[in-house]
Regions:
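Surface-exposed extracellular loop regions of Gram-negative outer-membrane beta-barrel proteins
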Residues: 151-160, 170, 183-229, 240, ...
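Outer-membrane beta-barrel strand-turn architecture
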Residues: 59-63, 134-138, 184-188, 224, ...
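Signature of Gram-negative outer-membrane beta-barrel scaffolds
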Residues: 40, 66-187, 204, 209
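Surface-exposed loop/turn segments flanking beta-strands in extracellular/periplasmic regions
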Residues: 4, 13-33, 81-114, 162-164, ...
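Tryptophan-centric aromatic hotspots in well-structured domains and transmembrane helices
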Residues: 50-51, 81, 117, 125, ...
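Short sequence motifs at beta-strands and strand-loop junctions characteristic
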Residues: 41-49, 116-124, 153, 168-175, ...
């Protein structure tokens, strides 16, 4: 009964004269119905499990040169489902044509049963990163880079099989980043610095699987971020001042919006910060 875009009741919802949802009338209608509850409360369940391994290496090769690197491995598995929480006075709920794949079209559902959707998402992540830093008395500079292999897979436990499958293939992405910076200390108390970077980021999981099933959007673009920062610092024994400005351009962002019972997958958005 709620439009998730506006936070307001959908058209046709039972309302009081004060403009709020009339749950009392809904419960009376549910109790009198011979076809089960028409209005119910449900709980959306999002159960996330993350496992990770992080290993790093650091070596100061000379008085001025330091190298840092490492490996970042992660595995994510997320369960996403909706369960009936309250039948609001009715004896049962009949999903009809919206029954999940493991339910029949004439299923009689009670509190605690699954409705609407039941899916599992997997993300496998393995990345390498490195940073080199060179420091002198008056100045310092660094250069860092990273490369990551990411793979997404969708399990549609509640939906009907597509081409005989309920589990998608893995879809692979290879985002990377590079960033550099320079700092110059022109007196004991004053310094200026500049940083710049370019990053690519794999599209979000729901941009790759926008239809809540195993059919993937093969054209989901990488998000691309370019950023610059310029700053000035002043420090004494008991006072610190930092002034900085930045410019960030973010291209090919993706977002998804629900319109009624349908979803819109919007790609190619650009932003400047």
């Amino acid at each position: 009964t709620i439009d998730y875009n506006t936070g307001r009741p959908k058209d046709g919802a039972m309302m009081t004269t004060d403009g709020v949802i009339d749950f009392h009338s809904a419960m009376e209608a549910n109790a009198a119905s011979e076809n089960g509850s028409e209005v119910i409360f449900t709980n959306a369940i999002n159960d996330h499990k993350w496992y990770g391994l992080l290993s790093s290496y650091k070596n100061r090769f000379t008085e001025n040169f330091t190298l840092t690197g490492g490996f970042d491995g992660r595995y994510y598995r997320g369960y996403h489902a909706e369960k009936i929480d309250d039948l609001l006075g009715g004896a049962y709920y009949a999903p009809g044509s919206k029954a999940l794949d493991f339910q029949t079209s004439d299923a009689i559902l009670k509190e605690g049963d699954y409705v609407q959707y039941y899916s599992v998402g997997e993300i496998v992540w393995a990345g390498l990163f490195a940073q080199a830093e060179y420091t002198k008395e008056k100045w310092s500079a660094f250069l860092s880079a990273s490369l990551t292999e990411e793979a997404y897979r969708y399990h549609d436990r509640g939906g009907a099989p597509i081409d005989g499958k309920k589990i998608s293939d893995f879809y692979h992405f290879l985002p990377w980043s590079v960033k550099g910076g320079f700092n110059y200390k022109f007196t004991k108390n004053h310094n200026v610095f500049v940083n710049a970077g370019y990053f690519t980021r794999a599209p979000f999981f729901n941009a790759v699987f926008p239809n809540n099933n195993i059919v993937a959007n093969d054209n989901a673009p990488y998000e691309k971020i370019m950023t610059f920062e310029l700053g000035y610092g002043f420090s004494t024994h008991n006072f610190n001042l930092a002034l900085n400005g930045y410019y960030t351009r973010w291209n090919d962002k993706t977002t998804r919006r629900q319109i009624g019972d349908e979803y819109a997958n919007i790609t190619g958005l650009d932003a400047v910060h």
